[in-house]
Every structure is written in C-alpha cells, then in structure tokens.
Regions:
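A cross-kingdom marker of C-terminal helix-rich interaction/assembly modules
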Residues: 1-69, 74-244
Length: 244
C-alpha cells in the first residue's frame, strides 16, 4: 500500500470506514481488542478528515493541521502497543479506566513508554522514519522553530508565505502530508495483519467456550467470561459517574 497525495489520504480514510462497517455488522459481538480498534478508527478517521479539510487549499495551508500529525502518531502507538502485550483484557481495563499505559509491560517485560514503542515500530517496519516523524511531529504541539520558520511576512498589506529551510512552502507542505500518509499506512498495516491475528485468536477462544457451554448463547458466553464490551461499558460509566 503506497500513499502519495491527499487523494491517497482520502483512500485511507475510506479503508478505515470499511473496517468500521465490519464492526457495525457484528452488533454487540465484540472482543476486547475490538473495543480498542473501534476507538482508534473513529479517532483516526476524524483526524484525517480534519487534516484534509485544513490542507486541501494549496494557497492557504492552515498551520492548525500540523499538530494533527502528532495526534495520529498517538493512534499508531496505542494500536501497536496493544499487539505487544500478553493480557489484552488487563490492558483494556487500564484503557477504560483512563490509566496511563506507560507502566504497563509487554510480553518481554518492557514498559510501554513512547520511546520504546517508537523503537519497536521502527524495527517492525525496518525503517527509522517513524522516529524522525515522532520527533518532528512533537515539535508541532508546542510553539517551536517549526512555527517560526513558517511565520507570515507582510508585503503591501497582503500576507505572504516565507520560504522554509531553503524549500518553498509547497515542498514543505508536501512533506507534512507525506508524514501523515506514512502514519496512516502503518496503522492500516497493523490493523490488517496484527489485529486480524488477534481477532482470529478471539474467535478460537469463543469457539472453545461454545463447545464447553452449549446451553449458553454467544452473548452470555462473552458476558460471563469477560469477552464482551458490556464489562467495559460498566467500568467506563462508573468512571464517568465518579467525575460528576
């Protein structure tokens, strides 16, 4: 899968919508990893829509789009982190109660800190590009030299974009779009491979429980053995009530 333009970013958004439609077809028959995937897809899709809206006018590339690259990187890190753990149910419990994942450990006993996840992500895809994207995208969250470089100058009362780091504005803007595209590409890759395997394992577990408990419906099995999203709803609503 290769993305090059905003149109390709639109295509990735459409692929995410296809993923979401598959989950809608399942109704309430969700597994713990499904709850996380749906949350990530909804957030990623909204970020893509906002980024496209803010960057489609080549004459007025809105700098408000820049922090969205870091937010999408956040989606990628959360998605990938969840494929590295032994107990996804426990991680989901951490997720719905709003606790930080940093202290949660993966299968090898390493804490899920961002620096570690970036390194693992680079190993997975055989490139250091995500380390570079993460560092640069983080600069967009706060006022930094990135914003100073793209500040506007006035010429006869009309705003004029300055050149950036010896590149013209259009080249710089294309670089930003490329970063967002690469993040989307990696996210979709993980959803299509790692999460496909996770869902397969979940279905195998469900199949085993069906044989062991033939009198129970699928939803009763999922609720009883902690595979359904109802458990997470209960925890989440309890958390919301505690904040009132």
């Amino acid at each position: 899968m290769s993305f090059k333009t905003i149109d390709d970013l639109r295509n990735s958004r459409n692929i995410m919508m296809e993923f979401l439609s598959q989950y809608r077809d399942l109704g309430e028959l969700w597994f713990p990893n499904d709850v996380l995937v749906i949350s990530i897809l909804n957030r990623a899709n909204s970020i893509n829509e906002a980024f496209i809206e803010l960057t489609t006018d080549s004459d007025d590339y809105n700098v408000a789009a820049f922090p969205l690259i870091r937010l999408q990187m956040d989606n990628l890190l959360y998605c990938y982190a969840s494929t590295l753990v032994d107990d996804l149910m426990e991680l989901m419990g951490c997720f719905v109660t709003g606790n930080n994942w940093n202290n949660f450990k993966d299968k090898d006993g390493n804490e899920l800190k961002e620096s570690y996840l970036i390194r693992k992500l680079c190993e997975k895809f055989g490139t250091t590009v995500f380390e570079k994207i993460y560092k640069r995208a983080s600069d967009y969250i706060h006022l930094s030299t990135e914003y100073i470089g793209i500040s506007l100058s006035k010429n006869g009362g009309e705003p004029v974009k300055t050149t950036i780091e010896n590149y013209d504005a259009s080249t710089y803007q294309q670089g930003l779009t490329d970063m967002m595209i690469l993040i989307n590409q990696a996210l979709l890759n993980i959803l299509a491979t790692d999460y496909s395997c996770l869902r397969h394992e979940s279905h195998k577990a469900l199949q085993k429980l069906r044989l062991e408990h033939p009198t129970l419906s699928d939803m009763e099995i999922l609720d009883r053995f902690g595979y359904s999203n109802n458990r997470f709803r209960a925890v989440f609503h309890k958390r919301l009530r505690s904040k009132e």
